[in-house]
A protein has these predicted regions:
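Alpha-helical transmembrane segments and their immediate interhelical loop/hinge regions
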Residues: 1-87, 91-97
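Hydrophobic alpha-helical transmembrane segments of membrane transport and translocation systems
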Residues: 94-167
Length: 167
């Protein structure tokens, strides 16, 4: 807040402060969505692997929940770990585990993420997918991580400009 005051001309200070507060709120909601997504995916994986009969299903689910925060890499690592553990039990179980993770990942990417971001952050699901694609192209994994919060801030800025919001 003090930083904004020091760089903003006085006539824009109130408007920029309001924009900053709203953008921070959306970013907080994005973090809530990420935590909820981690919990949901851990639950889905735990139940799915338990049904399949994979040993240590719930330990793997905890790992999935933790690694879920790292886009693309986290699910690949946790899915690979689960598949290897299942392969140590049987080849067929390893194959079913791999199929399960692919389906779960597709469901997450195409349904869960867009819906949670729409509900909690207020961004259009298409905008979320586009932001993540652009983020991946520009910044790799870090770009994907920052894509939705940046898109939320930009959305708030455009909303502010379109509606001429004040505090």
């Amino acid at each position: 807040d003090d930083f904004l005051s020091s760089i903003m001309p006085p006539q824009f200070e109130a408007r920029m402060h309001g924009l900053w507060v709203r953008a921070q709120y959306k970013m907080g909601r994005w973090l809530q969505a990420q935590i909820l997504l981690s919990f949901i995916m851990a639950l889905i994986v735990g139940i799915g692997l338990w049904i399949l009969g994979v040993k240590y299903a719930f330990l793997i689910a905890i790992i999935v929940g933790i690694l879920e925060i790292v886009p693309y890499v986290g699910p690949i690592v946790s899915g690979g770990l689960a598949t290897l553990l299942a392969l140590s039990q049987s080849t067929v179980l390893g194959l079913w585990t791999l199929i399960f993770f692919i389906v779960a990942q597709q469901m997450e990417s195409h349904i869960l993420i867009p819906l949670l971001i729409k509900k909690l952050v207020g961004l259009n699901p298409v905008a979320v997918i586009l932001a993540m694609l652009v983020g991946a192209k520009l910044g790799g994994i870090l770009g994907i991580l920052l894509a939705v919060p940046i898109a939320a801030g930009i959305d708030e800025l455009f909303d502010d400009l379109a509606n001429r919001k004040s505090i």
